[in-house]
UniProtKB/Swiss-Prot annotation:
Chief place of localization: cytoplasm
Organism placement in taxonomy: Bacteria, Pseudomonadati, Pseudomonadota, Gammaproteobacteria, Enterobacterales
Subcellular location(s) per record: Cytoplasm
Keyword Nuclease: yes
Binding site for a divalent metal cation: 16-17, 108
Name assigned to this protein: Ribonuclease HII
């Protein structure tokens, strides 16, 4: 992996998203400015960490970061805008929610939303940039908790297990029970289920 070279600035925010692929729920983003005086050991892409480790880091990031913020785009916004534009909106909301204005923003992936400060997209940033790794952890823990809460209301869909992604089990239950109000109606499998139900 090519070592990432940071921009020459102090207040760098990292931004990442979770939940572009699922058929249900919001896309959740986070923005994090880390404190160089309070390093956090073991930051890595949230998908590579165990749930226990993620939860421990989640608490540590919230405690030690100079500033952190969550952003989101709800299913109806995803349906209105499309998933890419809704993700960009959620990222803008996360950055706007920081109580300290960053001087530079590093975003996981290959494109940046329009922001009032300079920004750069970093491919595989969640495993190369500590701030993006931290954002990835906050976003994933938050969204996973939302899926667990939704699972209590709709136990038949198995949201706690598949987190809303289009697994064979989820698609089977979608066909069997139809879509909930939390499903993304513009996504093809949900659209099909709605057409079958009508």
């Amino acid at each position: 992996m090519i070592e990432f070279v940071y921009p020459h600035t102090h207040l760098v925010a990292g931004v990442d998203e979770v939940g572009r692929g699922p058929l249900v729920g919001a896309v959740v983003t986070a923005a994090v400015i880390l404190d160089p005086a309070r390093p956090i050991v073991g930051l890595n892409d949230s998908k590579k960490l165990s749930e226990k480790r993620r939860l421990a880091l989640y608490d540590e990031i919230k405690e030690k970061a100079l500033s952190w913020s969550l952003g989101r785009a709800e299913p109806h916004e995803i349906d209105e805008l499309n998933i890419l534009h809704a993700t960009m909106l959620a990222m803008q909301r996360a950055v706007a929610g920081l109580h300290i204005a960053p001087e530079y923003v590093l975003i996981d992936g290959n494109r940046c939303p329009a922001l009032p400060v300079p920004s750069m997209a970093v491919v595989k940033g969640d495993s190369r940039v500590a701030e993006i790794s931290a954002a990835s952890i906050l976003a994933k823990v938050t969204r996973d908790a939302e899926m667990a809460a939704l699972d209590i209301i709709f136990p038949q869909y198995g949201f706690a297990q598949h987190k809303g992604y289009p697994t064979a089990f989820h698609l089977e239950k979608l066909a069997q029970y139809g879509a909930t109000a939390h499903h993304r109606r513009s996504f093809a499998p949900v659209k099909r289920a709605l057409e079958l139900a009508s």
